């Protein structure tokens, strides 16, 4: 197996196959669920808006893949600093049956100098998730923070407040995941000594098998080849799947999606 094939197989099994579009429908989510089951293995999860969780749960069960996890988003995509709303949305997502919640950190508040509200928001959402055995991923929106010190600070605050994963991006802004921001965030995980309990998720802009290979190489360099499993590493993507399957000898690499 070539290096690209090996990394593509790893990446496929770490995917949060995503649709977060305004025109999402039950039919589109059902189609997404069908895509999670591939000839070379299943994706780790799907990531969808909360209202589609029940139909996704039913579809995954019917196709014989109930173990595929369902992630959803809250405080999304704006990352406002209203803790009550973020918490209410997170509780609603849990009530819908989410296995994982990807909450947007109040990154603009941090850029304006307020570190406390981010901590408090993540901590409140974490308490709700922990009580329901739901994983919490915190999206820090690196492409808006831009500055290395801010990316580092948002990562540190999220981890201190209880994040199970730190995630680069919503996929809804001009700049999403980059290898540079990924390295900064994973270095924070390493420097804080929390690699056993905190994972990393690049999202948005990871489109090709070669992209995925680059991101996995950074994780392998920092933590060794065994770290990036489904509890510690995810790719938030949709168009990536077709490219991975093509690298693995299935399909033509074409995808209808841009995430």
UniProtKB/Swiss-Prot annotation:
GO terms for biological process: 2-deoxyribose 1-phosphate catabolic process; carbohydrate catabolic process; deoxyribonucleotide catabolic process. It comes from the Bacteria. The keyword Cytoplasm applies. The active site is at residues 102, 167, 201. It is an enzyme of class 4 (lyase). One of its GO terms (molecular function) is deoxyribose-phosphate aldolase activity. SMART domains: DeoC. Pathway: Carbohydrate degradation; 2-deoxy-D-ribose 1-phosphate degradation; D-glyceraldehyde 3-phosphate and acetaldehyde from 2-deoxy-alpha-D-ribose 1-phosphate: step 2/2. Keywords: Cytoplasm, Lyase, Schiff base. Pfam families: DeoC. It is found in: Cytoplasm. Gene3D superfamilies: Aldolase class I (3.20.20.70). Its EC number is 4.1.2.4. It catalyses: 2-deoxy-D-ribose 5-phosphate = D-glyceraldehyde 3-phosphate + acetaldehyde. One of its GO terms (cellular component) is cytoplasm. The keyword Lyase applies. Catalyzes a reversible aldol reaction between acetaldehyde and D-glyceraldehyde 3-phosphate to generate 2-deoxy-D-ribose 5-phosphate. Belongs to the DeoC/FbaB aldolase family. DeoC type 2 subfamily. PANTHER family: DEOXYRIBOSE-PHOSPHATE ALDOLASE. HAMAP family: DeoC_type2 (MF_00592). This is Deoxyribose-phosphate aldolase.
